[in-house]
Regions:
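Non-catalytic propeptide/linker segments at domain boundaries
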Residues: 85, 93-155
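Surface-exposed beta-strand/loop patches in noncatalytic accessory domains
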Residues: 3-11, 35-77, 116, 120
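A metal-dependent hydrolase metal-coordination microenvironment
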Residues: 147-196
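Short beta-strand/loop motifs in extracellular/secreted proteins, especially
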Residues: 28-30, 40-44, 110-112
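Short acidic, gly/pro-rich beta-turn/loop elements at beta-sheet edges
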Residues: 42, 56, 102-104, 124-126, ...
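Solvent-exposed, flexible loop/coil segments flanking beta-strands in beta-rich domains
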Residues: 1-35, 116-120, 128, 145-151
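Beta-sandwich interaction modules
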Residues: 61-90, 97-101
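Hydrophobic beta-strand segments within beta-rich accessory/binding domains
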Residues: 19-38, 81, 90-95, 102-103
Length: 196
């Protein structure tokens, strides 16, 4: 399977653009490679939906030009929900941050595309083994009732950070390690337009 979907960043292009592609049966991975130059990546937020309309990947295009959804967290790009790749019509939804388009493009149109294949490969920015949400995007890996520390005192932490899910420089695992090394009591990644 191989499909190419075309999109455009411009002052006249729709802020929300969609494209669909057909996934065959017995597909194990979906690999989506985009052609947009890195300098324009942060202008675009992408969501990939399966045939049931469930979001299976959400990410701001800001780092590696390859997105992948697989059956495990090791073959799924950060921002993706690993699991079974169902047969049927899938959708890529591209949303542009319109308030920055004209200023950064000088008014010219910037075409870009996604090449979608069922030939997966290793993933540089993978989700990992700690999967927080299931295929229906229901959070199952976070216990809201668990108390990590009690007592009145000053707590040291950060409520506003970004990772490579949006426009940050770190993967979540690296950012978490840094927080531990700094002795933070809490660390909260607050991505642009992304829930994770």
């Amino acid at each position: 399977m191989m499909t190419v979907l075309e999109f455009e960043i411009s002052g006249t292009a729709a802020c929300r653009q969609t494209g669909t592609f057909q996934v065959p049966s017995a597909c194990k991975q979906l690999r989506m490679t985009y052609t947009l130059d890195k300098q324009y990546g942060f202008l675009v937020f992408v969501a990939v939906k399966d045939p049931k309309g469930q979001i299976r990947l959400q990410k701001q295009l800001s780092s590696t030009p390859v997105l992948q959804i697989g059956e495990t967290g090791r073959d799924t790009t950060l921002g993706g929900i690993p699991g079974r790749i169902c047969e049927g019509k899938w959708q890529i939804e591209v949303c542009l941050f319109a308030e920055h388009v004209h200023r950064l493009t000088g008014g010219k149109g910037i075409p870009f595309s996604f090449e979608i294949t069922d030939q997966g490969d290793t993933v540089e920015e993978y989700v990992g083994d700690n999967i927080w949400a299931d295929e229906q995007f229901v959070y199952s890996g976070f216990d809201q009732k668990k108390v990590y520390r009690e007592g009145a005192r000053w707590y040291k932490g950060d409520f506003h950070t970004h990772t490579r899910l949006s426009d940050g420089k770190e993967l979540p695992t690296g950012a978490s390690r840094k927080a531990e090394l700094m002795g933070l009591d809490y660390y909260m990644a607050t991505e642009h337009n992304v829930v994770h």
